[in-house]
Amino acid sequence: MAASRLPPAALTLKQFMRRQQVLLLYRKILRAIRQVPSDSDRKYLQDWAREEFKRNKSATEEDTIRMMITQGNMQLKELERTLALANS
C-alpha cells in the first residue's frame, strides 16, 4: 500500500476554511489599526491584536473558534465606526 502524500497533521477542509477566516480577520484588523492617527494608540492596538490572536492560537473547538471570529468581527466593526467618527 502506498504512503499518503499528505503530512499526518493535514487540516480538514473545514479547519482550512476556518483558518482562512481567522487570517482574513487578522489582516482586516491590522489594516484598520493602520488608520489610527496616534502612534502610541496604534502600537497599543497592534500589540493587543497580536497578543489576542497568539493567546487563542491553540483553540481547537469548532464552536469556540466560531464565537471568537464573531467577537473579532464585532470588535473590528466597532473600531471602524470609532475611526469614522474620529475622522469626520
UniProtKB/Swiss-Prot annotation:
Residues 1-19 form a transit peptide. It comes from the Eukaryota. Its main location: mitochondrion. GO terms for biological process: mitochondrial respiratory chain complex I assembly. One of its GO terms (cellular component) is mitochondrion. Keywords: Mitochondrion, Transit peptide. It is found in: Mitochondrion. Involved in efficient integration of the N-module into mitochondrial respiratory chain complex I. This is LYR motif-containing protein 2.
